[in-house]
């Protein structure tokens, strides 16, 4: 399929996990992709895997100057932008009673503030037919021990899409949320640990964690015109975890 032929996409958190899987799928479907992340070594490795239709920009979504550099690079090489996949996120476990201000700041700076400015700074390059995809989480609608800051940040992301769909009326730009469940990424392994991964996998009707490529496939659908009448929607790709 070439559903994204000629399209330009930005994927934050694009060097590993869901972001890398989405970048691979976007390129397979014809897109030119800019991946954005904090670790230069991981970015370089990702570009080596993705090939000539990928570029890497190092930076953090919590840094506005870094985001400015990202979009300056997009404008200089491609001129316009068709797809933004605001995928960068962090998550760690701290139970109520142990939560710190630093924990809240790190979580919300990346997952909420970072998402807001990733999208806002992209808008001048986007036009009719553009697609914005926000990474939510099954944790945004369900409770999980010691994950209150992360869960709250992802619930906020869900409602950003609702509000932005109103703000973007008349522009032809769509905004939707892709909410994965337990996925075998580096972030999940770090946040959940081995036992936590087993617990989450056992809670899904499919009795397993997702492969990042399965999430990337849905991101490609939301990026393409196949989802042209979708905005303000949340697509759960969670093995049924948050649906029962």
Locate the predicted segments by residue.
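Residue(s) in the substrate-gating loop at a strand-loop-helix junction
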Residues: 137
